[in-house]
Swiss-Prot record:
Its cofactor is Zn(2+). One of its GO terms (cellular component) is extracellular region. The keyword Membrane does not apply. This is Neutral protease 2 homolog MEP7. InterPro entries: Fungal_M35_metalloproteases, MetalloPept_cat_dom_sf, Peptidase_M35. Its EC number is 3.4.24.39. It catalyses: Preferential cleavage of bonds with hydrophobic residues in P1'. Also 3-Asn-|-Gln-4 and 8-Gly-|-Ser-9 bonds in insulin B chain. Keywords: Cleavage on pair of basic residues, Disulfide bond, Hydrolase, Metal-binding, Metalloprotease, Protease, Secreted, Signal, Virulence, Zinc, Zymogen. The lineage of its organism: Eukaryota, Fungi, Dikarya, Ascomycota, Pezizomycotina. Belongs to the peptidase M35 family. Secreted metalloproteinase that allows assimilation of proteinaceous substrates. Shows high activities on basic nuclear substrates such as histone and protamine. May be involved in virulence. GO terms for biological process: proteolysis. It is found in: Secreted. The gene is MEP7.
Length: 363
């Protein structure tokens, strides 16, 4: 989700794109529009209170936020300064034609509470002291609208928890172990298989081209990741090269890829999702409504959706990326630390001017 990180140096990565000159003045100044307060309810159960401090009503996007009912990452969990492994799902959402059900309306001054259990998506059975925090950017539409127009940057309070490991072990896990005997990467629908194979080939070409371009175009690295530090550029290129390799490894790669959702985690507005703990990527029905490659600057397509999802897979490159923000406006508001660990920063960086020289692979 738009989330958390407390670790000062999340060293890695990123995404390729070399143009789409949208004016920086296009970004609303919404640094203090949301107040997020975390409270402990009982052992591993947490309450988030979201307050609209803006001077107008908003429609907040629910996906990958506190409003998401799915097993998405709502807070970062740390023990002794080290992040705890997340065992839920990472989703890529549409940034266009979203249904009204994808939003939560909030009036000026209104507070909305949401409760969740952090033990449902992380193993906390060791017990003891933990710290949790959430930060990122929540996309929004204006009141009664569904067109994303900006993003509210937020950072919650840091909350310390004393967790009983035995009690944490009794919490039902949101994602059950997968049957390793099931060949989930077999796609029996020929049309979907053809689309997926094309997307993988296009992703391989696109990510490889973008990795090379990262070295040649520090101005664009600055635009998407807010740094031209050589170490960061190398990290960006390394992740993209890894994604290119994985996209081209249809038989012996580190991930499994399902062309249909057998786990009922798709819903309107979701393009695909990844289970990082299983290195499994799953396409949703709306994935197949996307073009193979878009000519629209910062648009979405099948190739960059594959690229986005592989950024979530630890088997491709570690540390795997989170979903701190979605869309160009949102990712432009992230700090360098969060941008380098944000999957959509990768897919947007990949969707740039150099695409004009990229031929769609059609066979």
């Amino acid at each position: 989700m738009l989330l958390c990180s407390m670790v000062a140096a999340l060293a890695a990565l990123a995404t390729p794109a070399f143009s789409c000159a949208l004016p920086h003045l296009d970004l609303p100044e919404d640094n203090s529009g949301l107040d997020i307060k975390l409270d402990s309810l009982s052992n591993t159960r947490v309450k988030a209170t979201i307050t609209n401090k803006a001077d107008r009503p908003l429609n907040l996007l629910k996906f990958n936020t506190f409003f998401d009912d799915g097993p998405t990452e709502k807070v970062g969990i740390f023990k002794d300064g080290n992040p705890i492994k997340f065992d839920g799902i990472m989703r890529r959402i549409q940034t266009f034609d979203l249904p009204i059900s994808a939003f939560v309306p909030i009036s000026p001054g209104e507070s909305i509470e949401r409760e969740f259990d952090i033990a449902s998506t992380s193993d906390l059975t060791v017990g003891g002291a933990f710290d949790i925090l959430s930060e990122g950017a929540i996309p929004y539409a204006e009141a009664n609208q569904t067109t994303l127009t900006g993003a509210m940057v937020f950072k919650s309070n840091a909350l310390q928890l004393k967790i009983d490991g035995e009690m944490a072990a009794t919490v039902a896990r949101a994602i059950q172990p997968l049957d390793r005997r099931s060949d989930v990467h077999v796609c029996r629908n020929s049309a979907k298989r053809k689309a997926l194979m094309k997307a993988l080939r296009n992703s391989a070409h696109l990510a490889g081209t973008a990795a090379s371009a990262a070295y040649r175009n520090p101005r664009k690295v600055q635009e998407y990741f807010h740094t031209t530090d050589r170490t960061a550029v190398r990290s960006v290129a390394a992740r993209l090269k890894a994604i290119s390799r994985e996209s081209g490894s249809t038989r012996n790669g580190a991930t499994r890829y399902a062309c249909e959702d057998h786990w009922n985690r798709c819903e309107p507005g979701v393009l695909a999702y990844t289970l990082p703990s299983h290195n499994l990527v799953v396409n949703c029905p709306s994935f197949y409504n996307l073009p193979a490659l878009t000519n629209r600057c910062h648009g979405q397509d099948q190739a960059t959706t594959v690229l986005h999802e592989f950024a979530h897979a630890p088997g491709v490159h570690e540390p795997f990326c989170k979903d701190h923000a979605y869309g160009y406006r949102s990712i432009r508001r992230l700090s360098t630390r969060l941008a380098l660990n944000n999957a959509d920063s990768f897919s947007l960086f990949a969707n740039g001017r150099f695409r004009r020289r990229f031929r769609v692979i059609s066979t």
